Amino acid sequence: SVALVACATAFVVTLAGCGSDSKTSSASSSSTTTSSVAQPLASSTTETAPAEPASACPMTPPANGGAPEWTLRGTTGSVAVTGSTATAAPVVTVTAPFSVTETQVHTLQPGDGPVVASTATVTVCYMGVNGRDGSVFDSSYERGEPVDFPLNGVVPGFQKAIAGQKVGSTVAVAMASADGYPDGEPRAGIAPGDSLVFAIKSLGAA
């Protein structure tokens, strides 16, 4: 339902998050974890899903895992990100624990639309991964539907990732705790100090 889809965005949109008592951890091998999609967070009615086709956020990762478009060595650990395509979800591979002290944004594929303002309301597909253990804490790709929200209502790191990019861009951000949830978000399994990684596809802005 729209309400259930909407709730998943509340975590990114608000500093408090909506969360649930469970989170989805991806399969892991040794200290390296590859993440694709997660289950949505608990219900909220603060956001609505836009009337976009489900294919806008492909649900299935590439069969071969995809070639990384960005690799980053952190203060600890490392991350490799393959952005989404028209037919495949993104892949985020974390060598845990991954952490950064400064937020870093990388454009995986530039778009050709207008530049996104810092106060815009955006339509995006996204996947969020916890650098501490490689678990996916939220993903609109799992639901197969994009979401929209105002950039002035999101955590700072998410705004830094999207504002200034062109619509149509595929972006990755390694987010320092200070730009995410410095005090943690227990309902999403985020502890104080956790660095977060997002793979994002910008579909529209108004």
Predicted regions, residues:
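Cross-family detector of peptidyl-prolyl cis-trans isomerase
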Residues: S1-A206
